[in-house]
Design a protein with these regions (language model features):
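Generic detector of bulky aromatic hydrophobic side chains
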Residues: 1-4, 19, 45, 72-74, ...
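Residues at secondary-structure transition points
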Residues: 39-44, 48, 85-88
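RNase H-like nuclease fold core
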Residues: 1-44, 55-58, 134
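RNase H catalytic domain
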Residues: 9-13, 51-135
């Protein structure tokens, strides 16, 4: 089973924003990635992380079962059809996710506490610190 952990963050929301994701197979990290977006909201950053992870998985793990873990209850609830997507910008991200989902056998989205998403969160902060402070 493939587990994907994604996270996004925005300092001062909206503010400087970044994304990160970690892909694990049998609890071993096989890929991790993060990047700076620019000025954006936290939700845009969260969805950017999800899309970046889905795109990487489509290129490298097509036709597999994917379990996604996110610490944003809003995003998980929107992807699982519990909450409606009202924002037009966010709707574009949901449509992109829906276009990528058929590349996989099965895909699930599960909400987890922030403390269980530390690796993806660290990539977000690393990308922000690197852009803002050069560290």
């Amino acid at each position: 089973m493939i587990h994907a952990f994604s996270d996004g963050g925005s300092r001062n929301n909206p503010g400087h924003a970044a994304w990160g994701f970690v892909i694990k197979v049998d609890n071993i990290t096989i890929h991790s990635e993060g990047g700076y977006i620019g000025i954006a909201t936290n939700n845009i950053a969260e969805y950017t992380a999800l899309i970046k992870a889905l795109e990487w998985l489509e290129m490298n793990k097509k036709n597999e079962n994917i379990d996604f873990f996110l610490d944003s209850n809003l995003i998980v609830s929107q992807l699982n059809g519990i909450f409606k997507v009202k924002n037009a910008d966010i709707r574009e991200f949901v449509l992109k996710a829906r276009q990528l989902e058929p590349s996989f056998k099965k895909i699930t989205y599960t909400h987890i506490p922030r403390e269980k998403n530390k690796e993806a969160d660290a990539l977000v902060n690393q990308a922000l610190d690197n852009h803002l402070y050069g560290i």
